[in-house]
Amino acid sequence: MSGPSSPSSTGHWDSTTTKPPQFAPRSHNDVYPFILPKRFRGALKDKVTIITGSAGTIGQALAECFAVAGAKLVLTYNNTPPPTTLKERCVNLGASDVSFVKCNVAELKGCEDLVKQVLQTQGKVDILINNAGANSLGLFDTQPPEAFIHELAVNLHGPYYLMRLLLPHFKSQHSGCVLNIASRAGTVAIPYSTGYCASKAALINLTACVQKELDVDKLNDVHLYSLHPGGIKSVMTLTSQILPLLNLHPPPSTHSAFTQAFDTLYDDSPYLNGMTCVALATGLAKHVLRGKYVDVGQDLEDILAQAEAIKSDENLYALHTSFLGGLENGGTGAGEKPGDGLKKSAEAEGGKEGFEFPGF
């Protein structure tokens, strides 16, 4: 890709600028050439891959995509088993093995039993995909606390449990990949979806924090990612059906905005997320995107072409906060060092440095 704002053919930029140039990656709502299944056929041969929430639209697509890559699939479900045809489809696509395990990821005991069973039967785990999710929707002040807590348990506690249980294994084998299916809801505020937004935001930051610890230990072959899987139509996103069932009656303008955002804009293929996850699991982007939050709608090839731009800006593909006046997240203003304001105040008053009750 070329253009006035694209990186040069050498991958360098003008040294007089403070940051490398950027260009907008191409956007997709379906599988595109860089992540075509045929490019990754057998790329994850015999890699033991746990996929939670495998019964849903996103989970089944993940299973099929990793099957093409030759993975050994451990597909978990809680209340609803995956369709009986899923195993046959995955085997026909190239999966080394397919097994189904009932597991409630919201409970630590269930996660412990799952990890123990997989390690005993398969001898290892190579890839963990935390895909199970819950979104009960509802007004914050009337939603039953049990529903809010359940969303946190499934969306955050489950991934935490499984990551916590498997990280020692990944460290001992010096390899492993975690793909946490988050959501754009983790980076924006959406009414009637408080528990979902809060838990997905926490999941994004959990991923980044754990990767930082792994990087300190120079375990570069243990790589984690959080992802927005795209706008995929599912029971969770068809608000035109859900809002009335939940007895939610927002103002007409709000209802209209929700209907358009969820029912019209949700037109992405679940295989876009599936093949992006396969590509990331192979490690082709770990030097740039490990620990990062990735929107699968952006062209991965275009993202990787801007590795230096991403490495030079910690806010890219990460949660961050912006303040007026350039205030940094550490609490100091642009160009100031911690304590500068205190020192100036103390010097002006002719007193010693320190905080004193200001009086009234």
Set out the residue ranges of the language-model regions.
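Conserved glycine-rich cofactor-binding loop
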Residues: V48, A55-G56
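C-terminal helical subdomain
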Residues: P7-F34, S226, L246-F360
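Conserved glycine-rich Rossmann-like NAD(P)H-binding loop of the short-chain dehydrogenase/reductase
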Residues: A69-T85
